[in-house]
Regions:
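Catalytic cores of phosphodiester-bond hydrolases, prominently lipid phosphodiesterases
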Residues: 6-16, 20, 24-27, 31-327
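N-terminal acidic, proline/glycine-rich, low-complexity intrinsically disordered segments
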Residues: 2-4
């Protein structure tokens, strides 16, 4: 009798487990179909949005060029109004690593398309939520309001003629609303502002290469070429910053960061450490021809410091609250 009860209990548990598995498979299949049915049209919508914002950017750049030419005070700012707790003289005499900037991340972003918003707030809510749903003013307006450090994402995007373009998008699939779709035009926007504000604190632009190792040597060649072409002598390259030093280990050991006074009206590009970092280093291991300085992740410094630290102008500390002792 006892054995019969045990056998019956096992069968019931087995039956229940099969039902649970069946419900899980059914639920996951339904979830997958819902996501798929929304994902495909959303990518199409995102592509159209990218083209719309590309055209918008062309018009905006034309507007800026006309405005700068017509009005000598257009986008001209007074740095003193953005400096708190110190005088302009104090800030200019400080070393670059002794001051803090107001900064924005994904500085080109202007929200989500309707389809992407549905996915992020609905089927993808557990993974994405509202963290990517925000809108910035244009980069020029941010600079006018005192932002002195911005972040741009660089995507290598294939073109119909077999070539490629560098575009500034958070995601070419889903997040394509950008005020700087054409990366070079976005750089031109920044350069026009610097031309109008030659006494500005040095601008810092963090560049994040998207696509992992797909952002390859030819993409970096194109990106560096843009930076040299657009900014010329205003661009603070590793070679310029290092001066007599051979590497940034020695540079940092001597606290050789230049004063803000010597960097007025200049711009520093920082390459955010990603999977393509080794590619960028390999193309110029002596840092003599690169346009961008390298910003290492703090975790990399801790794990692979000996290999990479000599290339690092600075370090990025994400989740800063966990590393208060390092700030």
């Amino acid at each position: 009798m006892a054995d019969d009860k045990k056998e019956g209990s096992k069968k019931e548990k087995s039956r229940a487990a099969k039902w649970v598995l069946a419900l899980f498979v059914w639920g996951f299949s339904a979830y997958f179909l819902i996501c798929l049915s929304a994902f495909i049209p959303t990518t199409i919508e995102a592509h159209h949005a990218e083209e719309t914002w590309r055209e918008w950017q062309k018009g905006y750049i034309d507007f800026l060029e006309t405005s700068y030419a017509a009005d000598s005070d257009f986008s001209k700012v007074n740095e003193e109004s953005f400096i708190t707790g110190a005088t302009v003289a104090d800030v200019y005499s400080a070393r670059l690593n002794e001051i803090r900037y107001l900064a924005s991340h994904n500085s080109y972003k202007v929200g989500l398309t309707q389809g992407t918003e549905y996915l992020y707030h609905g089927p993808f809510a557990a993974f994405m939520g509202k963290q990517f749903d925000y809108v910035y003013d244009t980069i020029t307006e941010q600079l006018n309001m005192g932002i002195r450090s911005i972040e741009l994402d660089a995507n290598k995007v294939a073109t119909a003629d077999g070539g490629f373009e560098i575009r500034c998008l958070h995601s070419s699939l889903l997040e394509s609303k950008s005020t700087a779709v054409d990366f070079k035009k976005g750089l031109h926007e920044i350069d026009m502002w610097l031309e109008r504000n030659p006494d500005s604190l040095p601008l810092i632009v963090l560049v994040e290469p998207k696509g992992g190792k797909k952002f390859d040597e030819e993409a970096f060649d194109a990106l560096d070429g843009m930076l040299f072409d657009v900014f010329g002598d205003k661009l603070l390259t590793p070679k310029k910053l290092l001066g007599e030093y051979d590497n940034f280990d020695d540079f940092r050991a001597d606290n050789a960061y230049p004063t803000v006074e010597t960097l007025k009206g200049k711009i520093i590009f920082l390459l955010h450490e990603k999977a393509s970092l080794d590619t960028y280093i390999a193309r110029d291991p002596d840092m003599q021809k690169s346009a961008m300085n390298i910003a290492l992740e703090y975790k990399t410094v801790m794990k692979k410091g000996e290999k990479y630290s000599k290339y690092a102008f600075t370090v990025i500390i994400n989740e800063a609250s966990k590393h208060k002792d390092r700030i």
